[in-house]
């Protein structure tokens, strides 16, 4: 906003260091009781003054020349005063608020002195000048008379200066003052009255000659040029504009001891003992002096500048005399002051002396104006405060706001506006029967919850008590966001610790909890949190599950869990599980689509999935603790649990299955039962269907019985046998090698395809060789393979990748395809339903690299016997290891070093004892733990680096092997 009328820079008090003479003739001032006259030119100010346009010419006008003595305190009724019209009309500022022609005077208005000289001869104007006094003089006593363009930021950095109190150095009152008394820091969490809460939405009222103002009446909605104040800041620890701006002008000070929120029941008879207020004030001088309209507020005037610090160790004292009242119907900026995150005094608050230290300017015994508070605030934050105010669904006069006890000050009954602003989505889902309980009680997880939800908290911004949504939404509004998805910040990710049941449920819809805003990028969008669950507990049982969940309320909102009383150490885990369930459900603020959006399918909404999952609690107390053992859904074709005809597609294990469910090994000779949690981690499945086994050994043992029912597994086994037969059979190997070699030389890299119309034809090939082939092998280059990529799908991509990597001079690619055909079981086996296959294609395909056959067909095959030059590795404890036979920790440590050395030597060659030689591994573990000796053991592993087997002798309990260089034949040459 720009000013249309240039300010008078020479007389403006913003330029404090320029000393100029006041324009116009200077008249004599009335002598004060101190009998010292004021100097001719004004003293420089060392504090910047924030003044509205109504206050620009107040200090340099003729009204400041002579000020009579203030009237007695009894004359609190405002005196009517008319203004003469100005001969010269000034240009009006576009940013100044336009006062309506009539305003209702406040009942507590200060006396106003008439103008003198030329000012008294001016004619009355239709509207007040924005640079002079308003039409109604009582408005000059407003504590928030400050234009938004002159707002000065008072917070936001470590260099913030505490506001100062500009004293009123006028003539002393007739009675001698009781002495300077230090201020008491007024820091009080209190709920403001209804008039304060509705102040931001009320406009200017018409001014009339009525003596009393009728407060309880609906106010029309005006839209002025002033910044709207916040309306929902009552529950925060931070003093809010509503706390600071109340109907009682003396409420900015605290005369007595500071009470807590629970002390109000005892202080109902003392309505003015501890009024609420901010912690710091900033005063500017006023061109007129008058006494306050409340005569019951004693206290001397001030005559010095001093900072108002935050620490509460200052002594109590009488409050200063506050002059003027408030007009609750005026739309103006609100006083806002927030405390810093830490004290300015550090560890020793009393080391800085008295709070009313030395004066910054030499004081003169001249008539000063009444001290008047002005509050400064960054007006860019008003928008976010207004948005936070619109997130609370209850009116300010409802019982939801009455959780701080009775109000210890006078209130004004103000009717709430008839058309409130639309409600925004917030983090307190409280439109149900009970109001949100964000700050009423504290739970043991709320502290970490605030830290989780506050993204990057700044040190100078104190967190509200239990109001994580306010900190989150406040920063969301504060940070501008682009329309493109790249410009948006990703949603908050919360890491929790829970059971696999909840982990699986939230994993079902990992993208459903994202930012789902309305059509625009305005402030009405809804933020959703993406939970990321980490599994840590796997021993949950049905008896430990919470018996009831109170997360379902009218409107689909969630509410915090009730506070569980500590009833013993045995129920600690039960309470933690209940709170964990409620905490997860609280993440979903409202999973329903907003108005105007198409409703999502029920399967895509996380809300119904969470409801179905978390409400699946066990039956009554008579039900068994564990669910009956059942086979996994994958083994739907087993004899113990036959599958229904339509369950083939749904036979995969449920990711949201309960952790108390059990899974049984499909091997009939094992039937091992494990919990669903352990089964998901350790169980192995068939490669062709969803049949699970507890280990690979059980899968191999059950293959003969399983392949009778698993059609795809049986056909896949045929493919593997064909590939092995092509390697082992000499005539087949030479024939296929010749075809592949000629195809590569003529058409480049490619694949040799061998197809069978049925598993029976493949069996004939295995029995009769080349004479049993029904289809001749075909060589396709990679370019030709690309033309058939559509029907092959991912298998074609795998073939192309392997075709670019193989070495044509040494091997070729052989692909075997077998059509599944009718799923007939082998003869002699009972007809059982087939388990659910992993793929439903009509053909099973497998490929492998096959080495090219030798050029001479008469060349004998190489002998398969073990070579005499096989490498031998002898493993003993490392050199320097001693004390293997000792008992205690020293001996155990020595044996552990020997064990680590043996494993390291084998792992360098790609051998893992635990998997390949588990018996030897168990012997070594017993040797380390219990010093149980065993005889030297010989194993024949394969070196993964060379592919050749070697002999390894493990002698863990023998003496350490001598150093290799000591046994060297050229030891002397190496030393010399």
Curated annotation (Swiss-Prot):
Residue ranges of the region described as Disordered: 21-49, 61-136, 220-242, 264-294, 412-443, 539-574, 614-660, 855-888
Modification sites for Asymmetric dimethylarginine: 749
Transmembrane annotation, as ranges: none
GO BP terms, alphabetized: cell-cell junction organization
Composition-biased stretches (Low complexity): 616-625, 633-655
UniProt feature, compositional bias: Pro residues: 98-113
InterPro entries xref list: Apical_junction
Alphabetized UniProt keyword annotations: Cell junction, Cell membrane, Cell projection, Membrane, Methylation, Phosphoprotein
Annotated Gene Ontology cellular component terms: adherens junction; apical junction complex; apical plasma membrane; cilium; plasma membrane
Start-end of Basic and acidic residues biased regions: 116-134
Residues with PTM Omega-N-methylarginine: 322, 749
Location of Phosphoserine modifications: 52, 129, 468, 509, 512
Cellular compartments annotated: Apical cell membrane; Cell projection, Cilium; Cell junction, Adherens junction
Role according to the record: May be involved in the control of adherens junction integrity.
PANTHER family the record matches: APICAL JUNCTION COMPONENT 1 HOMOLOG (PTHR21517:SF3)
The protein, known as: Apical junction component 1 homolog
Taxonomic source organism: Homo sapiens
């Amino acid at each position: 906003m720009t000013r249309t009328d240039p300010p008078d820079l020479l007389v403006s008090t913003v330029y404090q260091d320029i000393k100029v003479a006041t324009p116009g003739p200077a008249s004599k001032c009335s002598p004060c009781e101190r009998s010292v006259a004021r100097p001719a030119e004004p003293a420089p100010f060392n504090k910047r003054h924030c003044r509205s346009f109504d206050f620009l010419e107040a200090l340099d006008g003729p009204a400041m020349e002579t000020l009579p003595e203030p009237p007695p305190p009894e004359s609190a009724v405002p005196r009517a005063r008319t203004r003469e019209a100005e001969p010269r009309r000034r240009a009006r500022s576009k940013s100044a608020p336009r006062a309506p022609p009539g305003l209702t005077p406040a009942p507590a208005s200060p006396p106003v002195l008439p103008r003198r000289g030329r000012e008294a001869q001016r004619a009355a104007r239709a509207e007040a000048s924005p640079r002079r006094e308003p039409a109604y003089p009582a408005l000059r006593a407003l504590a928030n008379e400050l234009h938004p363009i002159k707002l000065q930021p008072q917070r936001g950095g470590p260099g913030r200066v505490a506001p100062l109190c500009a004293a009123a150095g006028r003539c002393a009152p007739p009675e001698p003052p009781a002495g300077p008394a230090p201020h008491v820091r007024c820091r009080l969490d209190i709920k403001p009255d209804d008039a304060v809460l509705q102040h931001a939405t009320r406009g200017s009222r018409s001014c009339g000659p009525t003596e009393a103002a009728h407060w309880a009446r609906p106010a029309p909605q005006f839209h002025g040029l002033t910044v709207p104040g916040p309306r929902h800041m009552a529950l925060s620890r931070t003093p809010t504009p509503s706390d600071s701006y109340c109907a009682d002008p003396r409420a900015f000070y605290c005369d007595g001891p500071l009470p807590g929120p629970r002390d109000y029941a005892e202080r109902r008879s003392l309505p003015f003992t501890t009024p609420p207020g901010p912690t710091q004030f900033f005063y500017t001088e006023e061109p007129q002096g008058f006494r306050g309209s409340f005569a019951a507020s004693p206290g001397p005037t001030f005559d010095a500048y001093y900072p108002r610090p935050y620490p509460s160790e200052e002594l109590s004292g009488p409050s200063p005399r506050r002059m003027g009242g408030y007009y609750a119907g005026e739309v103006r900026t609100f006083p806002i002051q927030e405390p810093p995150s830490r004290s300015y005094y550090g560890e020793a608050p009393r080391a800085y002396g008295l709070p009313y230290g030395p004066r910054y300017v030499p004081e003169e015994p001249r008539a000063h104006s009444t001290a008047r508070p002005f509050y400064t605030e960054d007006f860019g934050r008003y928008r976010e405060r207004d948005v936070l105010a619109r997130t609370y669904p209850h009116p300010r006069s409802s019982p939801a706001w009455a959780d701080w006890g009775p109000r210890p000050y006078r209130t004004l009954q103000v009717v709430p506006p008839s058309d409130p602003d639309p409600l925004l989505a917030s983090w307190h889902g409280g439109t149900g029967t009970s109001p949100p309980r964000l700050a009423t009680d504290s739970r043991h997880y709320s502290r970490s919850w605030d830290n989780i939800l506050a993204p990057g908290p700044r040190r100078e911004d104190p967190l509200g008590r239990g109001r994580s949504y306010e900190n989150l939404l406040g920063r969301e509004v504060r940070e501008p966001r682009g329309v493109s998805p790249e410009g948006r910040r990703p949603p908050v990710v919360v890491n929790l610790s829970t059971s696999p049941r909840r982990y699986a449920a939230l994993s079902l819809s990992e993208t459903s909890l994202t930012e789902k805003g309305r059509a625009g990028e305005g402030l009405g969008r809804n933020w959703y949190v993406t939970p990321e669950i980490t599994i840590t507990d796997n021993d949950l049982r049905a008896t430990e599950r919470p018996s009831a969940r109170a997360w379902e309320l009218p409107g689909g909102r969630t509410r915090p869990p009730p506070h569980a009383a500590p009833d013993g150490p045995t129920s600690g885990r039960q309470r933690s599980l209940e709170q964990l369930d409620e905490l997860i459900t609280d993440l979903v603020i409202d999973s329903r689509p907003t108005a105007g959006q198409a409703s999502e399918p029920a399967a895509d909404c996380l809300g119904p999935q969470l409801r179905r999952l978390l409400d699946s609690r066990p039956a009554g107390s008579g039900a068994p603790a564990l669910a009956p053992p059942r086979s996994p859904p994958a083994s739907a074709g087993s004899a113990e649990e036959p599958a229904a005809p339509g369950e083939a597609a749904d036979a995969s294990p449920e990711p949201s299955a309960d952790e108390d469910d059990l899974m049984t090994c499909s091997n009939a000779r094992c039937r091992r039962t494990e919990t669903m949690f352990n089964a998901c981690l350790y169980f192995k499945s068939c490669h062709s269907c969803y049949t699970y086994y507890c280990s690979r050994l059980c899968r191999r043992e059950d293959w003969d019985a399983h392949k009778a029912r698993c059609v795809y597994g049986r056909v896949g086994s045929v493919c593997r046998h064909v590939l092995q037969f092509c390697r082992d059979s000499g005539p087949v190997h030479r024939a296929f090698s010749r075809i592949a070699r000629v195809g590569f030389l003529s058409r480049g890299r490619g694949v040799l395809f061998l197809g069978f119309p049925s598993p029976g034809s493949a069996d004939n090939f295995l029995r009769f060789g080349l004479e049993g082939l029904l289809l001749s092998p075909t060589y396709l280059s990679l370019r030709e393979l690309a033309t058939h990529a559509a029907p092959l799908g991912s298998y074609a991509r795998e073939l192309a990748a392997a075709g670019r990597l193989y070495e044509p001079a040494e091997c070729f690619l052989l692909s075997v395809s077998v059509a599944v055909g009718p799923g007939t079981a082998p003869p002699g086996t009972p007809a059982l339903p087939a388990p659910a296959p992993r793929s439903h294609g009509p053909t099973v395909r497998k490929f492998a690299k096959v080495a090219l056959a030798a050029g001479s067909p008469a060349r004998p095959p190489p002998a398969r016997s073990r070579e005499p030059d096989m490498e031998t590795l002898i493993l003993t404890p490392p050199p320097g290891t001693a004390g293997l036979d000792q008992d205690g920790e020293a001996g155990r440590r020595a044996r552990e070093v020997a064990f680590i050395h043996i494993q390291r030597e084998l792992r360098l060659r790609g051998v893992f004892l635990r998997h390949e030689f588990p018996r030897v591994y168990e012997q070594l573990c017993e040797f380390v733990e219990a010093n149980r000796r065993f005889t030297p053991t010989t194993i024949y592993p394969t070196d993964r680096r060379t592919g050749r087997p070697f002999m390894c002798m493990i002698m863990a309990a023998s003496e350490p092997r001598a150093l290799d260089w000591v046994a060297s034949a050229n030891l002397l040459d190496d030393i010399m």
